[in-house]
Structure formats: C-alpha cells, structure tokens
C-alpha cells in the first residue's frame, strides 16, 4: 500500500528531507549523469509544498511545488520523480494527478508551469499542459516549458 503525503515545507522532518534529497540525487544526478546542484534553496521557503509517496518506509515517488511570492508567476511543479524500483506501476500518473490537485486546492486561480524533459511532452499533455517554450537544453537534456491554465470557475 502506498502512503501519499502532501506537505508544506515546514512539515518536513529531517528523515523525510533526507529521503527526498537522496532520491532526487540518485535519479537526477547519478542515473541521468547530470552533475548539478539539486539543493537550490527552494525546498524550504515560502508556501512551497512537497508530494511524497512511501511504500514500506521507502520514498518511491516525489514532486516539488513552488509558489512564488509574485502573484503573476505561475505555480511550478518540478523534480517529478519515480524511483527505479517503482517504475512501471503508473506512479507518475498518480503523482501528477495529485500535484495538479494540490495546486488547484491551494492556488485555484494560478496557472501552472513545468520544465519537462522533451520526450515526456505527451505525458504532461494528458494533465492539460501545453508547450509554452521552444525545446531548450538544460544540463545536456532537451527540455520544453509547459503551461496549464486554471480551470474556469475555480475560486480562491
């Protein structure tokens, strides 16, 4: 059974923070051979949130939601990740559904943005994201900016 959690950054304890940083490093830095500073100063500020999926006390899926203080800046979903041990279980779909739901619940009138690896454009399109930029290089991997407008009728 999977334990899904949607936490404000202030709710993260040290073991949880360690687990999410470890998973991000394992996949984004080591597996994808992409040396970059993952700890970017955005994890523990403002209204930022963290979505976590746990099974047997192991973090198996994660996403970060960044809410800027600027009301004109879209809410950003990023660091979307499923551990190697849990791939093939459709957790990415469940994770993105929960990420979009969290954004709609917390910031219903805000558009959403994500920087997608270009080959995952169709995956994110199923959640209402459309291309917002041309394809660009980020750390040697082709990416595309994608945006999702708020659903009509949503109120703050």
Q: What residue spans do the PLM features occupy?
A:
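Conserved catalytic-core motifs of GNAT/GCN5-like acyltransferases
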Residues: 113-115, 125, 130-145
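Conserved beta-strand in the GNAT
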Residues: 52, 58-67, 74-76, 81
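Short amphipathic alpha-helix that is part of the acyltransferase structural core
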Residues: 1-58
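A conserved beta-turn-beta hairpin within the catalytic core of GNAT-like acetyltransferases
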Residues: 67-77, 87, 106-110, 138-142
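Generic C-terminal helix-cap and adjacent flexible tail
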Residues: 149-156
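Conserved GNAT acetyl-CoA-binding A-motif
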Residues: 96, 103-117
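Conserved acetyl-CoA-binding loop-helix of GNAT-fold acetyltransferases
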Residues: 82, 88-101
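A short beta-turn/loop motif at secondary-structure boundaries
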Residues: 40-45, 69, 137-138
């Amino acid at each position: 059974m999977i334990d899904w959690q949607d936490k404000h950054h202030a709710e993260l304890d040290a073991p949880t923070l360690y687990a999410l940083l470890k998973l991000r490093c394992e996949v984004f830095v080591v597996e994808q051979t992409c040396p970059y500073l993952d700890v970017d100063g955005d994890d523990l500020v403002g209204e930022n949130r963290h979505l976590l999926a746990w099974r047997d006390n192991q973090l198996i899926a994660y996403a970060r939601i960044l809410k800027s203080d600027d009301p004109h800046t879209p809410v950003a979903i990023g660091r979307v990740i499923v551990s190697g041990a849990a791939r093939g279980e459709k957790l990415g779909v469940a994770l993105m559904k929960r990420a979009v739901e969290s954004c709609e619940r917390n910031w219903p009138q805000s558009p959403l943005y994500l920087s997608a690896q270009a080959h995952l454009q169709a995956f994110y399109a199923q959640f209402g994201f459309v291309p917002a930029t041309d394809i660009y290089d980020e750390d040697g991997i082709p990416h595309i900016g994608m945006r999702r407008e708020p659903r009509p009728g949503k109120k703050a």
